[in-house]
Amino acid sequence: MNLFRKISEKLKSYEDWVTEANYYLDEGIYDKAVECYLKALEKKNTNPIDWFNLAYALYHLEKYDSALEAINEALKISPSNIYFAYLKGLIHYKRGEIILAYKYLKKASEKIKNEELFEILGDISVKYGRYEEALKYYLKSYKMANSKNLNALFKAGKIYLLFGDIDKAYDAFNEILQQNPSHECKKIVECMENVVNAINSYEDLNNGLTMIKNKDYIGALKIFNKVLQIDENSDISYYYKSVIAEIFEEYKKALEYIDKSISIFNRSLYYAKKGDILYKLGDEEGAIEAYNKAIKLNSQNPYAYFGLAILYYRKGELEKSSNFFDKVLETYLEELSEEDISALNLYSLIGKAETTGIPKYYHEAMKYVDNLINLENSSRWWYVKGYIYYKLGNYKDAYESFMNALRVNPKDISTLKSLAIVLEKSGKIDEAITTYTKILKIVNSLQFTCEIDNILEKLRSRKPTNLEIPSVLFDIPVMYHKPNITCFYASNLWKYMANNNPIGAYIYLSFIESYISLDEISQMVNDIKSKLSLEMYRYCELIDDYKSDESVLMQIKELLQKLGCML
C-alpha cells in the first residue's frame, strides 16, 4: 500500500496537491493541509496564495516560526496584499512581537473591517497604556455588522471603569447580560446595583435614627428591616437593631444582631457594642475581650474605652477604671455628634471624680450636662445635673434640678427617691415624707412598699435613714454611634475595599468627594480615586481571585482618619 501511495503521489500534479490542501484547510485538518501545500510548493512556488494558506495552517498549528517564514514568502511575491499583512501581524502577535504586530495589523485595519482585528488592536493598545485608543478599537469590534463580540464589549466596559465612568461601564455590562445572562460581568452589575441601593438607603437609616432618639423603637425597627430588604448586607442596620434590642433588654437578641454586623464588616464599632451586650449578659471576660478587639482594630474608639471604664468601675477596680476614663477624655471625637461627645465626656468626668475623689471633675462635668440639657430638655440630663450638685453638697440646686426632671417626667421613681434624699439632707423631713408617700401611690409592689414604709417610719421618728443617691454610673443609657453622612459613606468605602470590592469603594468615594472642602483632603481623594480606577480594572480581570491592594487600603484608612471617621 505504501508503495502504491508513493507512486500515486509522484503522479499528482501541482493542481492536485493544491486542491487536496484546500480541502483539508476548509475542513480544519491543518496538519494534512500543511503536508499538501508543501508538496504543491515543491512543484511550483510562485503562487503567493499557496504560501499564505500554508502560513495560515501553520498559524493554527501554533508553529509560528514556520508560519512567519511562509507569510514572508507570500509577501515577497505580493508585498501590497493587505490580507497577507493581516496574517503576518497575527503571527507576530502570537510570537509576542507586539510592536511589529501593531505595525502590520494597523495597516491591515485601514481596509479590513474585522471584529477580531479590532479586538487585537485594542489589546495591544492596552499593553502600551493607550486606553482611549483601545476603547475605540473594542467598540469598533463590537459594533461591526452582525458582530456578537461580547468579549470586546466587556473589555470596553473595563476601560470605562479605568476612566472612572461607572455609568458607561454599567450600560456596557448590562448590554452584555441582555445577550448572555450568565456572562461573568453579572457579578459586577449586581455589585453596582447593590451599592447604589445601599447609598439610597441612607435617608431611611437617618429616619430610623431619628425614631430611636424619639423613642419610636418599633417604627425604627420597621425602617431598618426595610433597608435590609433592599440591602441584605447592611451591617449598620443590624447594628441599630442590636441597639433597639439592648434598649428593650433583650440581650441575647442584641448579641445575635451585633454578631451579624460583625460577620458582614469586621468593625471596631461593632465589637465595642458587643462588649456592652456581653457585659449585660454577665459575661465579663467576653466583654473585656470584645472591647480589646475593638481597640485593636481602632485605638481611637471611645465606646470601647468607656465600656471598659464602666466595667471596672462596677467591679470596684477604680484605678483601672480611672485610666480608661482618661482614654475617653483623651480621644479625639470629631466624628461623633455633639450629643454623643457631651454624654461621653460627662460620664467620664463623673467617673474621674468618683475614682479619684477630686471634686473639680464634677465642676468640669457641669458644662457638658448643661450642653445636653440645651440640646434636649430630658429628665435624664436634669437628673444627672441634680446628682452632680448632690455630690458637691449643693442640695438647694440639686433640689431644683430634680424638680426640673420631674416636670418632664413626673412619675419617675428614681428622681422622686433622689429628691426625697436631698430633702432629708436639707433638713426638710416633712417634705421628704410627702415625697415618699407620693412614691407609694405610684408603685404597686409589696417589696417596694415595705422598703418605703421602713424609710417613712424612720423619718417620722426623726431618725436618719443614712440613704445616699446611687452613682449615675450604674445607670448609663444605651450608647450607640450616630454617623454623619460623610462618615457613613467613608465607613462603607472602607468596608467595600476591605471586602475586595473596589467598584463599591469607588462609588462611595465619589459621593464623599462632594462633601470635601479642604484642599489637602481633596488631593488625597483624587489620588485614591485614580488608584481605585486601576483596582476596578484589575478586579474585572481577576473577579473571584481579586485581592485589594494593601497600599490602597492603608491610604483609605489614612483618609478616614483625616475625616475623623471611626471604623
Swiss-Prot record:
Task: Output the InterPro entries linked to this UniProt entry.
Answer: TPR-like_helical_dom_sf, TPR_rpt
Q: What is this protein called?
A: TPR repeat-containing protein MJ1428
Q: Which UniProt keywords apply?
A: Repeat, TPR repeat
Biological source species: Methanocaldococcus jannaschii (strain ATCC 43067 / DSM 2661 / JAL-1 / JCM 10045 / NBRC 100440) (Methanococcus jannaschii)
Give me the TPR repeat coordinates as residue ranges: 14-47, 48-81, 83-115, 116-148, 150-183, 199-234, 236-268, 269-301, 303-335, 344-379, 380-412, 414-446, 505-538
Entries under PANTHER family matching the protein: CELL DIVISION CYCLE 16,23,27, CELL DIVISION CYCLE PROTEIN 27 HOMOLOG
A Pfam family of the record is TPR_16
Q: Which domain of life is it from?
A: Archaea
